[in-house]
Amino acid sequence: MSFDIAKYPTLALVDSTQELRLLPKESLPKLCDELRRYLLDSVSRSSGHFASGLGTVELTVALHYVYNTPFDQLIWDVGHQAYPHKILTGRRDKIGTIRQKGGLHPFPWRGESEYDVLSVGHSSTSISAGIGIAVAAEKEGKDRRTVCVIGDGAITAGMAFEAMNHAGDIRPDMLVILNDNEMSISENVGALNNHLAQLLSGKLYSSLREGGKKVFSGVPPIKELLKRTEEHIKGMVVPGTLFEELGFNYIGPVDGHDVMGLISTLKNMRDLKGPQFLHIMTKKGRGYEPAEKDPITFHAVPKFDPSSGCLPKSSGSLPGYSKIFGDWLCETAAKDSKLMAITPAMREGSGMVEFSRKFPDRYFDVAIAEQHAVTFAAGLAIGGYKPVVAIYSTFLQRAYDQVIHDIAIQKLPVMFAIDRAGIVGADGQTHQGAFDLSYLRCIPDMVIMTPSDENECRQMLFTGYHYNDGPTAVRYPRGNAQGVALTPLEKLPIGKGIVKRHGEKLAILNFGTLMPEAAKVAEALNATLVDMRFVKPLDETLILEMAARHEALATLEENAIMGGAGSGVNEVLMAHRKPVPVLNIGLPDFFIPQGTQEEARAELGLDAAGIEAKIKAWLA
């Protein structure tokens, strides 16, 4: 879409932060209003992350107005909230391409702009990186400032607290801003507290505070009395004792939608020494009433009509794999009181809404804490329960040591329901589920299953849940199922595949939901088609049988080729000295950028035409 200067006259004056800082201060509220309307207009036409950005408009304007970006370095945690940042930093006219193939990256991305200091997508990394950047800036000696913006969800992760603990120890000059959009302490947001924030962030208070510490540092009783007095005074109106104990100078909470007040506070804080913590209160979805009322639904949106106030229903009548999992979970929980379900802040995405309502005492959302989620599951298993950890493939990476140390070594019966396996699409490199087969396959005693359709997914969930000799994993993709009939649940024989079609010369060994494409290729090439089902343990007998009866084999998976299921097939053949040629087809050795799932598969040769072309070229 073309930028409408008449509709956004103030925003039209700002195509860079240098131009922003030339605006008179009194025009900034109007700029914020136009920026919010432009964000609504753009994202509703193109799709993308929505509610978070609406809540950070004033903060973004204030930060770029006060700080000399890009010289001063601004780091956004996760990046869902950074659309206004992209608009103000030279990407205004391209915002309609965000999350699309060849368009703007969905998150801050170093290769896209000098304003994007840290490439992000996963949560809770900003403070750790910010400390390193602040230390480097201090050694550089050019008075470069460092600011990290982190949300109230991301700050719950252990990594954020590890970083703050370190910052309190080495005391770099940096500012951490907590964007709190839960409004959990909204009663503190008002004229008194805004005045207090400006007072506490001022140089007079700061100098008195630090000077008093130095004067009385040698008199422990007086030092302790002063500390307690200060905490008592601040504690009456400030909920920041935790951050103070970690070594930060805490300011807030303040109104995150008062751009003028934010500018005053940020100007005061810019020159303070040591780690600073500013707590701002915002409303997710601010300025668009439907998003304010339902920020979860409007977190990420498809194209929609803003005037309707609602999002279009998903196309197609087929359920998604997440719903298949959620239905199985509820069905099983109704029969087995030992089932416990765990998610690290992915209730909606993992299909667990209905379960959380029907079985609230057996549903555990541990927040953005993947490591804790996995070891918590270990504890439940030790206690005699049957934990199911529902987690995205890309986020399970964050708990790899816990999978090995706390579950696999102890052979605990924990089942991982791995959603978003394979190509995810619009969220790009940070969210593709490209590696789970590779990093799980090498773990002893792990059983790994790859369903080819929704019925097989249900059977595998049932099989994994009733397996008691160690951990299991069932991985399934983002998107709709295939429409096959659902049969009664029964346990599958562990480590056994099935032949779906008999052919000649070539056998295709398929792992997962690329089966429809594999079936088309097998038909076109008159090849044998095998649904391998299990990545671990592999059906070695079936693999050797296929090698003996065919001139060549091709493996197919939506996982990295390196270390994936195909690599396992190669290992079996080499161990048995079978010199049959094998073509491994899967995800290549690079990080896959954003685009639709269909676009990515076509470009990577993982649609039927691409798979057939790869095999023909290899056989030629």
From Swiss-Prot:
The keyword Chaperone does not apply. Binds 1 Mg(2+) ion per subunit. Pathway: Metabolic intermediate biosynthesis; 1-deoxy-D-xylulose 5-phosphate biosynthesis; 1-deoxy-D-xylulose 5-phosphate from D-glyceraldehyde 3-phosphate and pyruvate: step 1/1. The keyword Flavoprotein does not apply. Keywords: Isoprene biosynthesis, Magnesium, Metal-binding, Thiamine biosynthesis, Thiamine pyrophosphate, Transferase. GO terms for biological process: 1-deoxy-D-xylulose 5-phosphate biosynthetic process; isopentenyl diphosphate biosynthetic process, methylerythritol 4-phosphate pathway; terpenoid biosynthetic process; thiamine biosynthetic process. Thiamine diphosphate binds at residues 80, 121-123, 153-154, 181, 288, 370. Mg(2+) binds at residues 152, 181. Its EC number is 2.2.1.7. SUPFAM superfamilies: Thiamin diphosphate-binding fold (THDP-binding), TK C-terminal domain-like. Pfam families: DXP_synthase_N, Transket_pyr, Transketolase_C. GO terms for cellular component: cytosol. Belongs to the transketolase family. DXPS subfamily. Homodimer. This is 1-deoxy-D-xylulose-5-phosphate synthase. It comes from Salmonella arizonae (strain ATCC BAA-731 / CDC346-86 / RSK2980). The gene is dxs.
